[in-house]
Amino acid sequence: MKIAFITPVTPYKENMGGPSGHPYHLLVERPQGIEVEIYSYNANKLSLETIEGVERELRVKIHVLKQPVSFTWILRLHLTFIRFFLKYPIGYYIRLPKCTVEQIKASSPNAIWGYGQEFSGILKQFKEYKRVHTVPDCYSLHWFRRLGCRFTLTSVRDFFRCVVNYRKYYRMERDYDTSDNITAHLVGEEDARFLKEINPSINAVFLRHPHYEIPKKIKSTKFSSPKIKLLVAGRYDLYMKEKADEMVKLLANKDNMGRLQCVYMLTFLGKGWEQHVEKLNALGYEVDHIKFTPDYIKEVCRHDIQLAPITVGTGTKGKVLDALANGLLVIGTPFALENIVVENAVSCVEYHSNEELLAVLRDIPDKVEVYEQMAEKGREAIFVEHGRRHISQQLMDLFK
């Protein structure tokens, strides 16, 4: 079987300048006998050398497409306000030039695969083919959840932006193609349900998110001593702000500091955490701040536990999946752990309040082996239910 894959970003083993990790890991362990040609706008700006490396790793041919002239001028002349007057999100209006459509058809693919919510318009250029549209999230659900979280709406402008984007994505997703020969692929169970509610005739399928890179040599789970290493991964932004602020306030409470300082050291991996790092260091905690690392997985593996204070979001949280797959115990909110096959108090720790978070942080040093076993069970669950080969096979079955 031959598949033509059309994507805004070039696949890469990590998220590099966009959601490049997901398609990479859907392809890297795909079944034998499936040929893939990739047509990418390379919005993540991978170098030619990097693209050639990806071609070898994924056993694919990558064609880099030029950005549409209209978009080039909109950006150059700072005319992005135009999107306000459009019925759908601006990316929906991208179409492949006729010569590229003919090039793809001339390569005789058996099916067309499109990536990203806004590429539904491009997939309409191939109506006669079997098509799979990897959305992968229901973006109207994203904006709907934002509207329900007042702390993310810091100004009238933010509120207005959420309302406008919710309406645009709702309209676009309501009008997704519902033909018999196209399937929408999502990585969130609630995303798939919400999309079907918007567009009852759509064939929408929920598949688990594959895990990303793991070390070639898997070590047994053993927490560090004398201090257990905690990790908070990701930028300090509105998706983590509320719960992260509460977490730092909890750590800074004088009633908790004496106990927690002695048993934990903390790393913030991502931008925007300077204020929290400075505050905790001043209080006597051992805190490190890494804004960027060239080898994300290697850095993750230096830690024992990942704290995931995610307040709002959709789909599957890739950084949480990375931590679980690499043997870290994840302590996270329901939003952090949604769509991941782990069970609270068995293979992860899910918390709903600051009191629950504090209780588990106090409990871990007294029951280290129990929590190490929990982390190991989390890793095992990810290998089984989120294995790349398993998920890739499920995806490729959609093209049949």
Region spans (language model):
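Conserved acidic donor-binding segment of nucleotide-sugar-dependent glycosyltransferases
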Residues: 346-355, 363-368
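Conserved catalytic-core segment of nucleotide-activated headgroup transferases in glycan assembly
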Residues: 22, 209-279, 291-296, 301
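Acidic donor-binding loop of glycosyltransferase active sites
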Residues: 301-315, 326-328
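Short hydrophobic beta-strand element within catalytic cores of glycosyltransferases
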Residues: 319-322, 329-333
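Membrane-proximal helix-turn-helix segments that form the acceptor-binding/catalytic region
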Residues: 25, 98-105, 139, 151-184
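N-terminal subdomain of nucleotide-sugar transferases
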Residues: 1-61, 252-258
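A short, active-site helix/loop in glycosyltransferases that binds the activated sugar's phosphate group
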Residues: 121-123, 164-203, 275-278, 395
